Swiss-Prot record:
Membrane topology: Single-pass type I membrane protein
Reaction(s) the record says it catalyses: L-tyrosyl-[protein] + ATP = O-phospho-L-tyrosyl-[protein] + ADP + H(+)
Domain Protein kinase: 621-882
Ranges of the Cytoplasmic topological domain: 570-986
TM annotation in the entry: 548-569
Enzyme nomenclature, EC number: 2.7.10.1
Tissues with expression: Ubiquitous.
Name this polypeptide is given: Ephrin type-A receptor 4
Phenotype when changing residue 40 to A: 10-fold reduced affinity for EFNB2
Length: 986
């Protein structure tokens, strides 16, 4: 009976050999300790009992490769206890191992007469040991892991049909602590074959995350344990934050923390830090990519941290590596000198070439040259004074004083910037040579009392430092101290000394001396105070009287103290006055209109974002649904809940994944623009999210969406007053932008958003600046083509965008609103629109459009931009219309359907023509005179009722001719209405 069962097992094994001998490729996070299928030769496991229990059997696969299996089938005898033990298995540091068993098992119900003795399970045991040579099975040493049951068992029918029913069970055991272990299989009466046994442990395989390498890491002892592993930065990188990850029990890496950054000169590519390519550089250890060398610089090796400047170009010490290399400026232009006696005023113009820098300043070099040989010049010295200063001038003019008279001077004006010191070149300066005129002498520096008596004082003095010519005489002014110059006397002398006689004894006198040349008198000297005495004595020379000297010196000291005090007080008052003036000026400026700041002028665009937009924590934002797709990514609606404030609905613009630095900069530039605006008719920026992905712009939510779609959806539902109110709101927002010197460039109904209260707000501030800078982009911007139908002709032709071109676009928006979102110029091509505008055609009034509104549209569409109204005037006009609703009741047409012909402002006056022929000749369409006559249109009253179908019917098929005729018809109809008093003036 046992032999029959064995045959059944063998037959089954032959049927499954293909399934167990395929290529043995295991997951990367599993390390195999034992695989019975990979053992060459016999397994040689120990069985107990040695006979009649587990038996090793070899079968051949389809490649004639032997497969070693163990089987047992003692189902006829009760109380079976057959053991099979593996060889010693090293654990290699693993604390938890997994046992994968593949086996087949016979269904006991398919065996006759074995109901009491046949089993369908077997037991799995393990035993830890440091001894790898144990020869016997000691059952009491083993710890049971589990009882293994088959999910599927086979029958005699399966054997006949060669149906594979292979079971696979995996069990784990741990924690393990000894060097190795044994596994054991206990049979208690089953008919079973062990096809394969694999023992393995799990590890988290070597990986690189955030530029940090994490080594192979064996999982922890528990099924829920996490092993913290510190990573090491890859080559050419450094730690920003300590890189760590956790190895999970399933062999998967979890929760990366920290990261490494590529060193300067390297960027991340494919998880590695690779050197910047030639022509690129990276200055700092950041997560940025290598940047192309700035203008006028290059790199000739890989891994450059900065770029070398081209010859003749330099980089200042405080210039960032990202800044272009620059060069010194050229010389100032148009130097003009103006000599006034011994003063010179110099003025000049800025250099033609600033070297590419904004930090330009000017230095003045003064040289005094000999009259006989102008080439022999020497520096002027410290006696010359410059206003406001000699070096570092920010203005283009300077005043130079205290020069010598009748002297040749050469002045050099040097234009310098941050890199001038690297290449001082005479080409950076311009010079002028002047000769000073005659001038009064300078003041006398020192006056002394040589001798003092009861009735006289002997004075002596030095020549002025700058006589500025021949001294003709000196003038001495003196008076009694207590008279305070109310009564003084004058003495003149050609010498540098004089005796003043006839003085009163014991009286204090004050003396002043000045010199005169042919140019006039110089300034008086500082006052000298002397007191006469009763006893003759000499002040200077032999035996000076100590009392008189003390009085004189004391008086001088007191006078000096007084002068210093007066000077300090004067300076304080001057500083206060200046500070007060500056404060007043600052106050005045702050009360003025804010001016828009172009974020593209910032060297670091992120600085503009930080300055004008508020950073919002991403946790405060809840995205609810996608409401549209923009140029940079999806547009969603959601909610914003900032701590301390109520929750509000918001619109969320997201930046799509895989963006470039330029796309991120362009995306956030709109936030930098919106953040500067604060007006009820301008879309409000709530803030930005830049510190995590996705990058987002958060604005207020406008429930009714874009104005054009909203109007089309609600065609005919609003009163004229409501429509004018919408236009007034748009105009008010545009007036605010215009006052801030901001040009929108893309004003259209599609870029106006409407909230639940029908308040219209201007939006979409992302129009590209490339139009101004790139002559090749005549019709192309970053977002696509220029909106020809909304754009002023000078902006199309010359890329000249101004507030006046925005006014043109506003007129188109008015037409869109009054036509309930109809497409401007209908199905005409862009080229036809451009041609029609150039020829003077304009859009006709929409159906039921008040004449006053259409006239305002025509004003906005004046060809000369200076003839168009300002936004402030537009708002005032709309206010008048709203206050006078009767002015909105007269419309330009009584037609029951919209007019689709362009209006020609050059149509002739109705009063100037008397017949259909005259009219056609006036508009240069007299070729169609016979067509009109044949169709019965013989009077002007009949002509004003024709439409496009009528023209086609009488044989006028050219679209441009139809438009021209219908435009003139519309103008005549309007003139006829005016003649009959049907228009109400505003």
């Amino acid at each position: 009976m046992a032999g029959i069962f064995y045959f059944a097992l063998f037959s089954c094994l032959f049927g499954i050999c293909d399934a167990v001998t395929g290529s043995r490729v295991y997951p990367a996070n599993e390390v195999t300790l034992l695989d019975s299928r990979s053992v060459q030769g016999e397994l040689g496991w120990i069985a107990s009992p040695l006979e009649g229990g587990w038996e090793e059997v070899s079968i051949m696969d389809e490649k004639n490769t032997p497969i070693r299996t163990y089987q047992v089938c003692n189902v006829m005898e009760p109380s079976q206890n057959n053991w099979l033990r593996t060889d010693w298995i090293t654990r290699e540091g693993a604390q938890r191992v997994y046992i994968e068993i593949k086996f087949t098992l016979r269904d006991c119900n398919s065996l006759p007469g074995v109901m009491g003795t046949c089993k369908e399970t077997f037991n799995l045991y393990y035993y830890e040991s440091d001894n790898d040579k144990e020869r016997f099975i000691r059952e009491n040493q083993f710890v049971k892991i589990d009882t293994i049951a088959a999910d599927e068992s086979f029958t005699q029918v399966d054997i006949g049909d060669r149906i594979m029913k292979l079971n696979t069970e995996i069990r784990d055991v741990g924690p393990l602590s000894k060097k190795g272990f044994y596994l054991a299989f206990q049979d208690v009466g089953a008919c079973i074959a062990l096809v394969s046994v694999r023992v393995f442990y799990k590890k988290c395989p070597l990986t690189v995350r955030n530029l940090a390498q994490f080594p192979d890491t064996i999982t922890g002892a528990d099924t829920s344990s996490l092993v913290e592993v510190r990573g090491s930065c890859v080559n050419n990188s450094e730690e920003k934050d300590v890189p760590k990850m956790y190895c999970g029990a399933d062999g998967e890496w979890l929760v990366p923390i920290g990261n490494c950054l590529c060193n300067a000169g390297h960027e991340e590519r494919s998880g590695e830090c690779q050197a910047c390519k030639i022509g690129y550089y990276k200055a700092l250890s950041t997560d940025a990519t290598c940047a192309k060398c700035p203008p006028h610089s290059y790199s000739v090796w890989e891994g450059a941290t900065s770029c070398t400047c081209d010859r003749g170009f330099f980089r200042a010490d405080n210039d960032a590596a990202s800044m272009p290399c620059t060069r010194p400026p050229s010389a100032p232009l148009n130097l003009i000198s103006n000599v006034n006696e011994t003063s010179v005023n110099l003025e000049w113009s800025s250099p033609q070439n600033t070297g590419g820098r904004q930090d330009i300043s000017y230095n003045v070099v003064c040289k005094k040259c000999g009259a006989g040989d102008p080439s022999k010049c020497r520096p002027c010295g410290s006696g010359v004074h410059y206003t406001p200063q000699q070096n570092g001038l920010k203005t283009t003019k300077v005043s130079i004083t205290d020069l010598l008279a009748h002297t040749n001077y050469t002045f050099e004006i040097w234009a310098v910037n941050g890199v001038s010191k690297y290449n001082p070149n005479p080409d950076q300066s311009v010079s002028v040579t002047v000769t000073t005129n005659q001038a009064a002498p300078s003041s006398i520096a020192l006056v002394q009392a040589k001798e003092v008596t009861r009735y006289s004082v002997a004075l002596a003095w030095l020549e002025p430092d700058r006589p500025n010519g021949v001294i003709l005489e000196y003038e001495v002014k003196y008076y009694e101290k207590d008279q305070n110059e109310r009564s003084y006397r004058i003495v003149r002398t050609a010498a540098r000394n004089t005796d003043i006689k006839g003085l009163n004894p014991l009286t204090s006198y004050v003396f002043h001396v000045r010199a005169r040349t042919a140019a006039g008198y110089g300034d008086f000297s500082e006052p000298l105070e002397v007191t006469t005495n009763t006893v003759p004595s000499r002040i200077i020379g032999d035996g000076a009287n100590s009392t008189v000297l003390l009085v004189s010196v004391s008086g001088s000291v007191v006078l000096v103290v007084i002068l210093i005090a007066a000077f300090v007080i004067s300076r304080r008052r001057s500083k206060y006055s200046k500070a007060k003036q500056e404060a007043d000026e600052e106050k005045h400026l702050n009360q003025g209109v804010r001016t828009y700041v172009d974020p593209f002028t910032y060297e670091d665009p992120n600085q503009a974002v930080r300055e004008f937009a508020k950073e919002i924590d991403a946790s405060c934002i809840k995205i609810e649904k996608v409401i549209g797709v923009g140029e940079f990514g999806e547009v969603c609606s959601g909610r914003l809940k900032v701590p301390g404030k109520r929750e509000i609905c918001v619109a969320i613009k997201t930046l799509k994944a895989g963006y470039t630095d330029k796309q991120r900069r362009d995306f956030l530039s709109e936030a930098s623009i919106m953040g500067q605006f604060d007006h009820p008719n301008i879309i409000h920026l709530e803030g930005v999210v830049t510190k995590c992905k996705p990058v987002m712009i958060i604005t207020e939510y406008m429930e009714n969406g874009s104005l054009d779609a909203f109007l089309r959806k609600n065609d005919g539902r609003f009163t004229v007053i409501q429509l004018v109110g919408m236009l007034r709101g748009i105009g008010s927002g545009m007036k605010y932008l215009s006052d801030m010197s901001y040009v929108h460039r893309d004003l259209a109904a599609r870029n106006i958003l409407v909230n639940s209260n029908l308040v219209c707000k201007v939006s979409d501030f992302g129009m590209s600046r490339v139009l101004e800078d790139d002559p090749e982009a005549a019709y192309t911007t970053r977002g696509g083509k220029i909106p020809i139908r909304w754009t002023a002709p000078e902006a199309i032709a010359y890329r000249k965008f101004t507030s006046a071109s925005d006014v043109w676009s506003y007129g188109i928006v008015m037409w869109e609103v009054m036509s309930y979102g109809e497409r401007p110029y209908w199905d005409m091509s862009n080229q036809d629109v451009i041609k029609a505008i150039e020829e003077g055609y304009r859009l006709p009034p929409p159906m039921d459009c008040p004449i006053a509104l259409h006239q305002l549209m025509l004003d906005c569409w004046q060809k000369e931009r200076s003839d168009r109204p300002k936004f402030g005037q537009i708002v005032n006009m709309l206010d008048k219309l709203i206050r006078n609703p009767n002015s909105l009741k007269r419309t330009g047409t009584e037609s029951s359907r919209p007019n689709t012909a362009l209006l020609d402002p050059s149509s002739p006056e109705f009063s100037a023509v008397v017949s259909v022929g005259d009219w056609l000749q006036a508009i240069k369409m007299d070729r169609y005179k016979d067509n009109f006559t044949a169709a019965g249109y013989t009077t002007l009253e009949a002509v004003v009722h024709v439409n496009q179908e009528d023209l086609a019917r009488i044989g006028i098929t050219a679209i441009t001719h139809q438009n021209k005729i219908l435009s003139s018809v519309q103008a005549m109809r309007t003139q006829m209405q005016q003649m009959h008093g049907r228009m109400v003036p505003v």
